[in-house]
UniProtKB/Swiss-Prot annotation:
Protein family per UniProt: Belongs to the ClpX chaperone family.
Organism: Clostridium kluyveri (strain ATCC 8527 / DSM 555 / NBRC 12016 / NCIMB 10680 / K1)
Compositional bias of kind Basic residues: 414-424
One MF annotation (Gene Ontology) recorded for this entry: unfolded protein binding
One example of a Gene Ontology biological process annotation: proteolysis involved in protein catabolic process
UniProt protein name: ATP-dependent Clp protease ATP-binding subunit ClpX
UniProt binding sites for Zn(2+): C12, C15, C34, C37
Covalent S-S links between cysteines: none
Gene Ontology CC terms: HslUV protease complex
Keywords in alphabetical order: ATP-binding, Chaperone, Metal-binding, Nucleotide-binding, Zinc
Gene3D superfamilies listed in its UniProt record: 1.10.8.60, ClpX chaperone, C4-type zinc finger domain (6.20.220.10), P-loop containing nucleotide triphosphate hydrolases (3.40.50.300)
Annotated region described as Disordered, given as residue ranges: 409-430
Domain ClpX-type ZB per the UniProt entry, residue ranges: 1-53
SUPFAM superfamilies on file: Glucocorticoid receptor-like (DNA-binding domain) (SSF57716), P-loop containing nucleoside triphosphate hydrolases (SSF52540)
């Protein structure tokens, strides 16, 4: 009988302990694992994960390295890229200092305000930063937010996007970057507090204060409004970098009124809007100007770093079309190569595209739309027309929407060998 009992005695397949020696033994297909081995495995995984987080946070590139990477994707805005690189470096340096230091001095959080005209590169700067730092990133539109209890999105939904982009890894999300666009659209309607409820303006600013400063927020896992019978995801926003962006149309007039010297009669200097250098005016912005625009003092206090961007001129728009790593010209050439068709942009065409973007006042954001309009019919026909080997975009093509088509010598195009693209992982440090 004793021999039969020994045979029936179950053991952990990993440590060899019998079921009598452990609290619990869990069975799998042909294997067993005890509670002690499960706990040990859990500790190993947890330790490795914490090490990974620490490595990511301690290997933050220096400001020069951050700017060098931004230079590859963002044309112009030299001062803005410098300021942003320093601010981001200091943000993650602060995280490391507060995590590792026993010092009484605790470094305060500094969120960033990107201020510049439409199409100047605000969103692109934030996206490129997050990609370089290899941290989760989320974009939110401030115009969709409303104060809790009203139709629209709660501010916590911003954090849900970040959590989703971190694959629900809360610790990674807590070191991410959130870009809130159109922040100028939540300015209160007048400088004086109103007795009526401003649910999409001042109310949203009030709701954003806590997450900007740093709090443990309760986020509904499915989004939407909170209700008392659902579970929440808890996330600490203390180490999340918030970058707010907006065009702030009209703030240049506020700055000008503050900075100009009052002159009367013949000494008065009158400038038209075209003659004003709005970029220079924006560089003189002070927190008081933001208050006059309609941001509340508490909100301005939580975005202490103000980075201004200039409107892009013709030369900058032409450079954007062809110079960055993912320039639009390069993207469209690759698209055509996938159909074994060569695409050529003449310099005169790039100039015409830039001029059209300036006319529309859309900045870099409008360049893609103009190219799409120019090549819509060609992109529709090319896959079906095997005889077309090359497409040339010249100045006339931008206005007539009729690019020059060149047929293959033998009546059928030959395959184009595509270069293999190299994907980049993690931050590139020197």
């Amino acid at each position: 009988m004793a021999k039969n009992d020994d045979k029936k005695q179950l053991k952990c397949s990993f440590c060899g302990k019998t079921q009598d020696q452990v609290r619990r033994l869990i069975a799998g297909p042909g294997v067993y694992i005890c509670d002690e081995c499960i706990e040990l495995c859990s500790e190993i995984i947890s330790d490795e994960f914490e090490e990974d987080i620490q490595i990511d946070m301690t290997s933050i590139p220096k400001p020069v390295e951050i700017k060098n990477y931004l230079d590859q994707y963002v044309i112009g805005q030299e001062d803005s890229k410098k300021s942003l690189s320093v601010a981001v470096y200091n943000h993650y340096k602060r995280i490391n200092s507060n995590n590792n230091s026993n010092d009484d001095v605790e470094l305060q959080k500094s969120n960033i305000l990107l201020l510049g005209p439409t199409g100047s590169g605000k969103t692109l700067l934030a996206q490129t930063l997050a990609r370089f730092l290899n941290v989760p990133f989320a974009i939110a539109d401030a115009t969709t937010l409303t104060e809790a209890g009203y139709v629209g999105e709660d501010v916590e939904n911003i954090l849900l996007k970040l959590i989703q982009n971190a694959d629900y890894d809360i610790e990674r999300a807590e070191h991410g970057i959130v870009y809130i666009d159109e922040i100028d659209k939540i300015a209160r309607k007048s400088e004086n507090p109103s007795i009526t409820r401003d649910v999409s303006g001042e109310g949203v600013q009030q709701a954003l204060l806590k997450i900007l400063e740093g709090t443990v927020a309760s986020v509904p896992p499915q989004g939407g409004r909170k209700h008392p019978h659902q579970e929440f995801i808890q996330i600490n926003t203390t180490n999340i970098l918030f970058i707010c962006g907006g065009a702030f149309d009209g703030i240049d007039s506020i700055i000008e009124r503050r900075t100009r010297v009052s002159t009367l009669g013949f000494g008065a200097e009158i400038q038209s809007k075209k003659d004003k250098d709005i970029g220079k005016l924006l560089k003189q912005i002070m927190p008081g100007d933001l208050l006059k625009f309609g941001l509340i003092p508490e909100f301005v206090g939580r975005i202490p770093i103000i980075v201004t961007l200039e409107a892009l001129d013709r030369a900058a728009l032409i450079s954007i079309l062809k110079e960055p790593k993912n320039a639009l010209v390069k993207q469209y050439k690759k698209l055509f190569e996938l159909d074994d068709v060569e695409l050529e942009f003449k310099d005169e065409a790039l100039e015409a595209i830039a001029d059209e973007a300036l006319k529309r006042n859309t900045g870099a954001r409008g360049l893609r739309a103009i190219i799409e309009e120019t090549m819509k019919d060609v992109m529709f026909d090319i896959p079906s027309k095997e005889e077309i080997a090359k497409v040339i975009i010249n100045k006339d093509a931008v206005s007539t929407k009729m690019p020059e088509l060149i047929e293959a010598e033998n009546g059928k195009r030959t395959p184009i060998k595509l270069k293999k693209s190299r994907t980049r992982k993690g931050p590139e440090t020197a």
